[in-house]
Amino acid sequence: MGKDTIANIITYIRNADMNKKGMVQLPFTNITEKIVKILLREGFVENIRKHRENNKYFLVLTLRYRRNRKESSKNFLNLKRISTPGLRIYYNYQQIPRILGGMGIVILSTSRGIMTDREARLEKIGGEVLCYIW
């Protein structure tokens, strides 16, 4: 049984969000860094910083919460892993689904790198569907 780094990222973020923790520490990989930068650009994450501890690198994320007068509510509604190591899911640019009518995002791994569904449609390229976030 191998490692699924993308599922681990999703699980770390989902668990921290459910426990209302403001910060998450993820192991650093190139894929992790690219996915987290997409989350920052789309507004799901407030801040990212690279942290070194015992010759190992980590990404420290600050999650974004909406501020209410009574209590702060979470911003992440749902994260779902689609393509797994045992079952890869590929779409061309016309088949890429729109999540909640465009309010959510699909993260794809394409021949030009990891990108969102909007970027893939603009460049007219498809790829492996990594996860849905809405």
Curated annotation (Swiss-Prot):
GO molecular function: rRNA binding; structural constituent of ribosome
Entry keyword set: Chloroplast, Plastid, Ribonucleoprotein, Ribosomal protein, RNA-binding, rRNA-binding
A Pfam cross-reference name: Ribosomal_S8
GO cellular component: chloroplast; ribonucleoprotein complex; ribosome
Stretches assigned to coiled coil: none
Stated family: Belongs to the universal ribosomal protein uS8 family.
Assembly with partners or alone: Part of the 30S ribosomal subunit.
PANTHER family named in the record: 40S RIBOSOMAL PROTEIN S15A (PTHR11758)
Name of protein: Small ribosomal subunit protein uS8c
Source species: Phaseolus angularis
Species classification: Eukaryota, Viridiplantae, Streptophyta, Embryophyta, Tracheophyta
Name of the coding gene: rps8
